[in-house]
Amino acid sequence: MQDPAAAPAQQAGGAPARIANPHLPIIGIVPSAELEENRLVLRNPYIDAITSCGGAPVILPLTADKRVYESLFPLMDGFLLTGGADISPERYYSTEHNPKKDTPTPLREELECLILSYAYKFDVPTLGICRGMQMMNVFFGGTLYQDLYDQFPLHDDDEPEQPIQHWQQDDWSNPSHFVRLIRDSKLGEMLDMERLATNSMHHQGVKELSPLLKPAAYGPDGLVEAVEMPNRTFMMGVQWHPEYFARKNMKCIFTALVNEAAAARRSGRVTMDPLRLVRDDGSNRWNVCRYRRNV
């Protein structure tokens, strides 16, 4: 008698169905929030970049109920922190006024804090893109320039008369400037080159680098353009948007995230144990929503 739960092909007398990879690595992705429209937004290139490398993307919700994340985080094999609006300057001890800053998104910032604390604690592979890299730096004790065009000398060290366009007007799938890769960094080894042409869509950037991170790339003007954490398996951030080149020379960045996520699940580094983010009184167990110099 055939097992009623067997695959349809087997029930029909055919060969048992073969599943090449029954568990794709699950990558939790942080969306942007459009507060005025009361909606979450995520550009398709993020999704395509993960799926094209064999990952299963899951868009995470923004909620004040931490029990939701307690249920979701243990299911994630890796995380992707995406680009988006400015980070609240209060998060990195800045009282400078920036008239160009975006409306803060507190729920998104809290989610990103929880992810980074969880990923650091359990060594869960995490990639930060643009704002995601900035949040990574801020969370682990670094600071930001609130507006590069007001606070940073935007010139090419090799061509002083040529200003750097960190917020390009051209199509986002076109590069706007080069970055210099640190060859002995994980990113430099993955890309196997000294200079990389990247796009650029940001007006903020790393000012003081977190003591837990090391630079992996610099812009022509000396701005830190990529970071990584030496004592974690895969904790990396890039200031540009590699998802627009994910089917070209930057696919290796997403492949590394997905492969490390799969390895983390196999090794047991990603915990499936019940997770408590909040205490019984509703306070935050890990106190990760206040930025600190020490983790």
Q: What is the predicted role of each segment?
A:
Residues 1-129, 137-145, 149-197, 203, ...:
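N-terminal beta1-alpha1 cap of cysteine-dependent amidohydrolase-like domains
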Residues 236-239:
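Active-site-proximal beta-strand elements of phosphoester/diester hydrolases
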